[in-house]
Amino acid sequence: MSDYKDTLNLPETGFPMRGNLANREPEMLKRWYDEDLYGEIRKAKKGKKSFVLHDGPPYANGDIHIGHALNKILKDIIIKSKTLSGFDAPYVPGWDCHGLPIELMVEKKKGKPGQKISAAEFREECRKYAAGQVEGQKESFKRLGVMGEWDKPYRTMDFGTEANIIRSLGKIADQGHLLKGFKPVHWCTDCGSALAEAEVEYQDKVSPSIDVRFVAADEAATLAKFSTPEGHQGEGELSVVIWTTTPWTLPANRAVALHADLEYVLVQVEAHGEQKAQRLILASELAKSVLDRANIEHYHNLGFAKGSDLELLQFNHPFYNFTVPAILGEHVTTDSGTGIVHTAPGHGQEDFVVGKKYDLEIANPVGSNGVYLPDTELFAGQHVFKANDSVLEVLKEKGALLHHHAYEHSYPHCWRHKTPIIFRATPQWFISMDQAGLRAKALEEVKSVEWMPEWGQNRIEGMIEGRPEWCISRQRTWGVPIALFVHKETAELHPDSLELIEKVAKLVEEKGIQAWWDVDAAELMGEEDAANYEKVLDTLDVWFDSGVTHFSVVDSREEYNFPEEERTHSADLYLEGSDQHRGWFQSSLISSVAMKGKAPYRQVLTHGFVVDGNGRKMSKSIGNVVAPKDVTNKLGADILRLWVASTDYTNEVAVSDEILKRSADAYRRIRNTARFFLANLSGFNPATDIVPAEEMVALDRWAVGRAFAAQQEIIKSYDEYNLHEVTQRLMHFCSIEMGSFYLDVIKDRQYTAKKGGHAQRSCQTALYYIVEALVRWMAPIMSFTADEIWNEMPGEREKFVFTGEWYQGLFDLAEGEEFNNEFWTDIQAVRASVNKLLEAARGEKVIGGALQAEVTLYADDALIAKINKLEDELRFVLLTSAATVKPLSEKTESAKATELDGLFVDVVASEAAKCERCWHHVADVGTIEGHEEVCGRCVSNIDGEGEERKFA
């Protein structure tokens, strides 16, 4: 028996079947950086239309988690796809480097500033610590295959960025949005500092729920307001009843608030057993629930009054020797409580607003550490949360406590310490939302932005409509200074603040933020002014640092120095987690509108949080944390990247070992498809072997047309950031259009046709065109694998797939083409029907394999007309040794019905000899002298001109 193996076109490639990504990716990464891939991309795209995705800076503390990986990979995929679409799309990664978490880490090692270490030394230690954290995170991001300006990222602690943050403050002040005020702000007693809205998270907390009596100072004046019948004005002490869950704020109480339009009832509590007679004022709607919880069963109503009638009546503070007024406020409701609100202007935003209206004292008896100040009567030196019990004791002693019980409710907590926070009035700097129309302008600008998903617009609108002034000052050491001078007596800003800010910014540019604390005011403004003005020693909220990066980074770095007419906004796209509507998206919008009068971004795209396979948050205690490093070490970054791109990331994104295993399986299918292409391009030189499109075999033309259609859909999905649609289309193309049909059909031709003949070269031309497109579709997502494929592809090419653009060599089938998509769809349906009967015949041992079969198709006239177009090449499409087509009228009894109407098929085992080269059973095997074991087709392919293929 002769060995015909050497006469076959066997697949051959250096592209391995197994990716072995965990080991091979680091080698590829090294080459990318050794050969300056990012620099090559920048050179290739210079002068192209710009696309700016501005990186929201992660905090420079700790290892990256799976949420960071999701975020950075999404950004990288978008940047790479934009690059392939012909944009100059630089990526400058950033880090948020100031603020409390870094201070706390340094405090652990070095002690608090001003104690064991000077403030200047402390700042230097913070800078070093942050720099180390940036380096660690940077290496982790690079390992994920994320390309960018890693050698020159932006860090909010870079001297130039710090200087620009200070300039931003100057611009906002110059536009009239800066405000100094003594206001209640979210205050963390552990941080010892104010918190921004975005630094507050809500958790359930158990608090004491108390109803407290404030006795009327002038009983007759109070009774006169109620419609009580003469002589029936009741008996016992007369009080209003307030409800609160923060007893510790009662020392700061300066009023009781009612709603002007609510009806209030004067209730007579009857003497009964131990219950003394007393009279209580409550909102009519809530009276029964208040009395029920106080276990008061015997009572009746004496009279009614409108809230507006009770304004300015005086009531005694429950434990201090002064009276407080009844005031009116829109914030009073009957949702819960008593309909009368305890008002402490120093401890609540609504209390503060209504307190200003009535010119109430903004009492603040609480220090920055949450402890009552030394002059706080009854409670000095106690921590507020521990003082709740003391307050209750005093209320009981004074007979002012009507009722109390434990109450679980949602309460603001510090996002860092996870501890309850307080509202505390302190002198702070604010960006005013209303004094110069900032809120209205910001809401207007929201409408000009494309929000993806669309619900993001309503979300941020609601937040901006309801948000308080932005408190931008912090009482911390490691932060950008609020570089302002205020008059020692009037507290007014220096009239030349803008010029002074520029002088300070220049110093900071040279020496960093320490320059502010070192510089003598006289150096900047002369001795005379310096005697009257003092430096502000507060630092800026870190959300201000990151919020103004549209100016401090995007408007300032040379990478973004694009023509002005291209840039309607500082950035085209911001892409972060959905929690950033209340964080970075909002701080960026407010600061940009305050500085420039417009939004900083054209589009805002959000992704959901990462959860486990059961939809639970990642938690070390549950043990469901998936660390990026573990995934890259075990499966490789491309699997992680494919997981990211396969998910509808606008919702919660699930990850688990099982989900990653599914990504690995999908990856293998794509890799095997690419390997088939490469292996079958062995010996193909595109410079000399390309077959002109019009001369290609019909099926090859169809395959290129399918790639053309897939490419259009894939580019559209990339443009719309619908990455899961990209992966779905890619999988469908590889598994269904190619794997289940085209690649299956062409194996015979590819392996057995004459080496270098038209039949093989037509097929290779199609494979070449398709792999040129496929490698580019993959590149943004499976970057390492695309690079590997690129280096195995035939022909002259650029060094990297990432510097090019989408492949332009594909073509669609011509209008009116005979062998069009519809034709091949019908043929695939015929093939699928025949395959089912071949499987059944194999199961019944009628045949061993499909090539042992001869099939007869009995079809209606319309189907025959289509099938017969393939002439004697139908058998190659069906993968059988023979295929005959006959009209339905000639159908035999042995022919079986198929799923297709009008098609019956008869399957018989071929009695012809098997060709030892192509394995087809054909009558002419052994009929040609010198080739006793092979068929005539194979002899032609070995020694002759080669078979002719027109259709398949």
Swiss-Prot record:
It comes from the Bacteria. L-isoleucyl-5'-AMP binds at E576. GO terms for molecular function: aminoacyl-tRNA deacylase activity; ATP binding; isoleucine-tRNA ligase activity; tRNA binding; zinc ion binding. CDD domains: Anticodon_Ia_Ile_BEm, IleRS_core. A motif ('KMSKS' region) lies at residues 617-621. Pfam families: Anticodon_1 (PF08264), tRNA-synt_1 (PF00133), zf-FPG_IleRS (PF06827). One of its GO terms (cellular component) is cytosol. ATP binds at K620. Binds 1 zinc ion per subunit. Its cofactor is Zn(2+). Its EC number is 6.1.1.5. Zn(2+) binds at C915, C918, C935, C938. GO terms for biological process: isoleucyl-tRNA aminoacylation. SUPFAM superfamilies: Anticodon-binding domain of a subclass of class I aminoacyl-tRNA synthetases, Nucleotidylyl transferase, ValRS/IleRS/LeuRS editing domain. Gene3D superfamilies: 1.10.730.20, HUPs (3.40.50.620), Valyl/Leucyl/Isoleucyl-tRNA synthetase, editing domain (3.90.740.10). Monomer. Belongs to the class-I aminoacyl-tRNA synthetase family. IleS type 1 subfamily. Catalyzes the attachment of isoleucine to tRNA(Ile). As IleRS can inadvertently accommodate and process structurally similar amino acids such as valine, to avoid such errors it has two additional distinct tRNA(Ile)-dependent editing activities. One activity is designated as 'pretransfer' editing and involves the hydrolysis of activated Val-AMP. The other activity is designated 'posttransfer' editing and involves deacylation of mischarged Val-tRNA(Ile). This is Isoleucine--tRNA ligase. It comes from Aliivibrio fischeri (strain MJ11) (Vibrio fischeri). The gene is ileS.
